[in-house]
Amino acid sequence: TDPYFDMVIDCSPDLKINGGLGSISEQLIDSGVHVALGGGMKHFTPLAEGSDQTVLELAKESGYQLVSNATELDGSGAGKLLGLFSPSTMPVMWRGQDDRAAEKPDPSFLNRIHSMLGSVTYPEPMDCESNPEYIDIPSISLMTQTALDRLTEEDERNFFLMVESASIDKQSHQRKACGSIGELKQLDESLAVAMKFAESHPDTLILVTADHGQAAQLVPERTLYSGIP
């Protein structure tokens, strides 16, 4: 069980029978949004509230084409599109060498008594490598391009598109710098796709922002590893 992503929360007040709006997956399908791409397949497989059909089945009835990997996404046709590419959070593109996360320094006994005494052993630097779980997973840039293509199928269509590289934050919570950096790279590549679109659609407004910073992104002014190429 992942302590960050699999929390049990009482959502009974949000049930439709209790006056709520229902699950987020049900709200998404009910909204009629034209394109939705990401992870979270497990939230669409339970029965919809008060129904003998799953949320996924209701999505198909509502006209959504369902795709579940990069190959299917790349070959998808016109119309409303629902892409669910993993049971929960999507795998990241990069990971630390042998799946390493950032490790804590190891202070000596004297250094624990006072920072000016003894010594501190620092972790060895690590390389980033491709994540072996990142198989047939669509890149954020592919999802961005697909969404832009779908949203401009009809002439003069006005639209709002939100693109998020959520695992920049999620990987930082687990001290997985390579995962976070790889997802930042993905976001940069998707921005390039959007900027290219804007060149031929000059009335496009692109906003790039972050909802908060991360302690993992704070580095000392004089890095301990400045001599490493």
Where would I find each of the regions flagged by the language model?
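A post-motif C-terminal structural segment
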Residues: 2-229
